[in-house]
Amino acid sequence: ALLNSKVASYVMDFLSPTLDYNQGAMGKIPVDVSEKIFDRITELSKQNISIAKKDWDSFETSWNFKRHYLVKEGHQLSEIYSVWQQECEDRYITLKKNEEEINSLFIELYGLEGELTSEVEEKYISITRADKQRDIKSLISYIVGCIMGRYSYQKDGLVIASKFMVDMSDVAGLDNDNIIP
């Protein structure tokens, strides 16, 4: 958490004014945190990791991708998208608030109240926000993946469909010649 805070960036500007952030310069950052503050920073860091993992795992590029976030049985796409949009915004706000609290704790700990603010600019929050164009492209990619046998709308996760599969009912809707009609 410290190395991702504004305090570390501020201190590293003095210890290593170039981009050479090796272990020697990083190891010179003094760390003296009370147990109470350490516990709070740990809690916030774990929340941030969980939020980032959930965000990352909602996309096909993740090894832990299960199912597209816009595919839910029995719901209108517009309703699903509204829920997705709210989930993204909630994650974004929580992550930003947590990062700012971590910054605030370290700024206070190092006595840098007059030098730094805890605010985190939006461009530095790496959590995905809902974007209709990107989300529809992602949904189309997932649907093509279902048609080609990479995914199944019946099962979560990666499904490698081939002529060697014993139970082809597991991949309903699979296109036999991999040419989408």
Describe the function of each predicted region.
Residues 31-181:
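Non-catalytic DNA-recognition/assembly elements of restriction-modification systems
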Residues 1-28, 36-51:
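Basic, amphipathic alpha-helical recognition segments used for DNA target recognition
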